């Protein structure tokens, strides 16, 4: 849909909307904000629920490690038998579940999930530190400061400063990239260290009014707190991607070395390690970048996802982790892909609408952003993977980072964004249409069926994980526990 074909003139036959058909930008911003926070709340509930399940599934591993630590201490000085204490605590619930009060069940569930939740909280903090240390959350070497002697670049700096004044924000630092792309993006943790990056090609193509629309969208995203919200969403999704990555590298005879490399990248987030791990977390089951490098003849590859080799006695030593890690990892990966990422993407689509409406509020010119979006359409190219969601338009072909790997696009289509701008006064030919009621009912029924199937699959995964935990974790731990207690007497 070309905007040049839908101008407001007699020849085009375009009929301006009436006042009743239009929507002021304050109402649009409030409406999209409510929708975004509703989906965000659903995403937070889903993430919390999934975190509790993942933490509970990993509980046997944590309690086994703690109990074995008590058993080792018991070899030197008397120490409590944690297995016996746990048996006394959960024995009545297993023997007579109908007699257990709901509060007691809640207490047992909290005790089961507590070690895993503490572990996940520590990992979240480490992942956030790693992502901030990674070059993927900054413009990197592709950016350079604006050249004051270049007219187009100085115009960009002036326009961004104008939009910042209109939004009552400190002026963000403005940078330019010489890459052959037609896009703009923001970087930073919050409004205090925000950066705006626009391509030189876009500066040459847009008029000053259209550049104001793009700057209004980017500054509007800063004002709406999209950088901090995007970082929190990325950290939450990368947590489940990390669990999935651990499951993906598990059946390997060098699992110990790979796990050490992975955790060292988190705990010591040097630039190269953090960047490598951040790239891998965008596709937790894919082949790591380090795998693609050729190895010498006869030598195994050394990446985090090195080629699977024949099992040996060292692999068998890791079998007690099969239940808690492998099944939990695939559980986290599936839920991340089909539940959490789509919910986050739906919320982010509303935030893009809200940034567009904020741009109209700052510029008072809905046509400016609409014309700019039309010129940018289909011209997106990757700027940086983990900040693709902070760009003006969808970066073509870029699926890196948890926010870019969803089955639901995180950006509305160009047509939908133009129709939303039309309600704010932009000159487009067709007003947005409501979805027909029969189609709404069909989609609602389809989502209900999918929800039931997902719940059933999750239940079966929990049962399967419990069985594998009892087989691979409980049995060897029980034998080792009895042996250590016998030696301690």
Predicted regions and their residues:
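Transmembrane alpha-helices and immediately adjacent membrane-cytoplasm interface residues
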Residues: 91-138, 148, 152, 161-167, ...
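Hydrophobic alpha-helical transmembrane segments
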Residues: 56-76, 93-117, 264, 306-333, ...
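Membrane-interface, cytosolic juxtamembrane amphipathic helix immediately N-terminal to a transmembrane helix
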Residues: 18-45, 202-237, 263, 276-313, ...
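Active-site-proximal gating segments in proteases and membrane effectors
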Residues: 2-11, 165-195, 260-316, 338-348, ...
């Amino acid at each position: 849909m070309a905007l040049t074909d839908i101008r407001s003139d007699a020849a085009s036959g375009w009929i301006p909307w009436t006042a009743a058909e239009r929507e002021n930008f304050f109402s649009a911003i409030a409406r999209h904000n409510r929708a975004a926070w509703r989906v965000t709340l659903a995403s937070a509930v889903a993430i919390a629920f999934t975190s509790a399940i993942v933490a509970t599934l990993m509980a046997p591993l944590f309690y086994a490690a703690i109990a074995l630590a008590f058993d080792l201490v018991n070899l030197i000085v008397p120490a409590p038998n944690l297995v016996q204490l746990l048996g006394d605590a959960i024995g009545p619930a297993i023997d007579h579940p109908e007699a257990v009060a709901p509060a007691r069940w809640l207490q047992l569930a909290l005790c089961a999930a507590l070690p895993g939740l503490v572990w996940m909280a520590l990992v979240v903090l480490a992942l956030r530190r790693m992502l901030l240390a990674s070059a993927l959350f900054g413009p990197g070497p592709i950016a350079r400061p604006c050249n004051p002697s270049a007219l187009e670049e100085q115009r960009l700096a002036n326009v961004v400063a104008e939009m910042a004044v209109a939004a009552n924000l400190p002026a963000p630092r403005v940078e330019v990239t010489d890459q052959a792309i037609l896009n703009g993006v923001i970087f930073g943790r919050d409004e205090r260290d925000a950066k705006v990056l626009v391509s030189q090609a876009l500066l040459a193509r847009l008029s000053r009014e259209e550049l104001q629309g793009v700057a209004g969208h980017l500054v509007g995203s800063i004002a709406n707190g999209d950088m901090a919200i995007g970082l929190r969403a990325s950290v939450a999704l990368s947590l489940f991607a990390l669990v999935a990555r651990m499951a993906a590298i598990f059946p390997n005879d060098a699992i110990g070395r790979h796990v050490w490399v992975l955790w060292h990248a988190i705990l010591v987030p040097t630039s190269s390690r953090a960047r490598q791990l951040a790239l891998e977390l965008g596709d937790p089951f894919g082949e790591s970048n380090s795998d693609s490098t050729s190895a010498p003849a006869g030598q195994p590859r050394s990446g985090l996802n090195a080629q699977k080799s024949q099992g040996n006695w060292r692999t068998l030593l890791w079998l007690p982790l099969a239940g808690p890690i492998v099944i939990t990892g695939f559980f986290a990966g599936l839920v991340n892909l089909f539940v959490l990422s789509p919910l986050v993407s739906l919320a982010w689509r509303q935030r893009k609408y809200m940034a567009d409406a904020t741009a109209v509020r700052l510029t008072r010119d809905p046509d400016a952003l609409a014309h700019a979006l039309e010129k940018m359409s289909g011209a997106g190219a990757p700027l940086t993977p983990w900040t693709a969601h902070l760009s003006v338009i969808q970066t073509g072909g870029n699926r890196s980072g948890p926010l870019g790997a969803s089955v639901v696009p995180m950006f509305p289509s160009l047509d939908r964004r133009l129709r939303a701008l039309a309600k704010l006064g932009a000159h487009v030919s067709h007003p947005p249409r409501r979805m027909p009621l029969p189609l709404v009912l069909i989609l609602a029924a389809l989502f209900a069926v999918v929800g039931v199937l997902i719940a059933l699959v999750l239940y079966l995964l929990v049962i399967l994980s419990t069985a594998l935990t009892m087989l691979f974790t409980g049995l060897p731990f029980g034998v080792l526990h009895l042996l250590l207690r016998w030696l301690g007497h």
